[in-house]
Structures are given as structure tokens and as C-alpha cells.
Curated annotation (Swiss-Prot):
InterPro entries: Ribosomal_uL6-like, Ribosomal_uL6-like_a/b-dom_sf, Ribosomal_uL6_a/b-dom, Ribosomal_uL6_bac-type, Ribosomal_uL6_CS. This is Large ribosomal subunit protein uL6c. Belongs to the universal ribosomal protein uL6 family. It is found in: Plastid, Chloroplast.
Length: 178
């Protein structure tokens, strides 16, 4: 039995969960999330505690146990508390702004970079160099943050680029003179 899969999921009071054999829907104050689940995953609910079980014990099914328990737990946390990722822009002239449901990045290219913001994600720019991303969907939030970061990944010589908050860049020494 999976160590993560056997852990119970506590459901907050303001979260509503509906499920059948192939789908689970989680509603809360920050939104509604829905995902498909395999029919071999069995969900039971009692006293605001959700447990994820298996209908058969084959190797491939046991591999899904912890995965779907974590996905459901992330949905519950997301609709009740939201997830947040903070990106920092480091570099001369690197700036960010939000305009018309797009984030506009000046990253040293000859043109500004425009990235469309998904509906489920809220973006706030603080002091032109810090981007706060919030969403109830952890997977989509991580993908969007990685998409923004891919435009200027941090480089090891000067430390310029787009960094996650708290990320440490391992610096390299430049060329040494003879």
C-alpha cells in the first residue's frame, strides 16, 4: 500500500466534493476544479474525511494510488486556500506589466514579450520586477510560471533572468586572465 495514498484527506467546511466512478469535482470559495479518475480508484467519504483506495492490487494500479490521492488533495487545498508562486526579474531593464489580460515582459529582447493570462490565474505585478501568480489549480499555475520563466532562465555568470522567489543561482567564475 502506498504511504502517500493511504493518508486521509481532510475536507474543510467550505469545500463541496462530488464524485462518481470516473470523475471528481471539487467546489470552494476560490473556484471549481474537475478531473478524470480511473475506475480502479475508489473514493470513500465519512465525517469530512476522504480516503482513496484501490479496487485491485496490480502493480500498475498501485502506482496510481499516491498520485490520485495527491491530485485530489491539491484540488481541495486549491479551492479553499489557493496556491501562489512569486517570480522575480533580475537584470538591467527587466520589467513586467499587466495589460488587457496579458502580461508584458521587457527582458532585453528587441521586442516586448506578451503572454496571455489563463482565466483561472490572477496576476499582480509589484514594483515592475516581482510577479505574483495565484490560482486554485496547482498544475496550471506551475505550467504558467514555467512558461514565463522560460523566456529568460537565470544564467550563472551574472545571475540575470527570471527566478522563483527564494531560488539560489549557483554562480560561476568568469574567464581568468593570463
Amino acid at each position: 500500500m502506498s504511504r502517500i495514498g493511504k493518508l486521509p484527506i481532510t475536507i474543510p467546511e467550505n469545500v463541496d466534493i462530488n464524485y462518481n466512478d470516473s470523475e471528481i469535482t471539487v467546489k470552494g470559495k476560490f473556484g471549481t476544479l474537475q478531473t478524470q479518475i480511473p475506475t480502479v480508484i475508489k473514493i470513500t467519504e465519512s465525517d469530512n474525511i476522504l480516503t482513496v483506495g484501490l479496487s485491485e492490487q496490480t502493480r500498475s494500479v498501485r502506482a496510481l494510488h499516491g498520485l490520485y490521492r495527491t491530485l485530489i488533495n491539491n484540488m481541495v487545498i486549491g479551492v479553499s486556500e489557493q496556491f501562489e508562486i512569486i517570480l522575480e526579474l533580475k537584470g538591467v531593464g527587466y520589467r513586467a506589466a499587466v495589460q488587457n489580460n496579458e502580461i508584458i515582459l521587457n527582458l532585453g529582447y528587441s521586442h516586448p514579450v506578451n503572454i496571455k493570462i489563463p482565466n483561472i490565474i490572477s496576476v499582480e505585478v509589484v514594483q515592475n520586477t516581482t510577479i505574483n501568480l495565484k490560482s486554485c489549480d496547482k498544475e496550471l499555475l506551475g505550467l504558467f510560471a514555467a512558461n514565463i520563466r522560460a523566456w529568460r532562465q537565470p544564467e550563472p555568470y551574472k545571475g540575470k533572468g527570471i527566478l522563483y522567489k527564494g531560488e539560489q543561482i549557483i554562480r560561476k567564475a568568469g574567464k581568468s586572465a593570463k
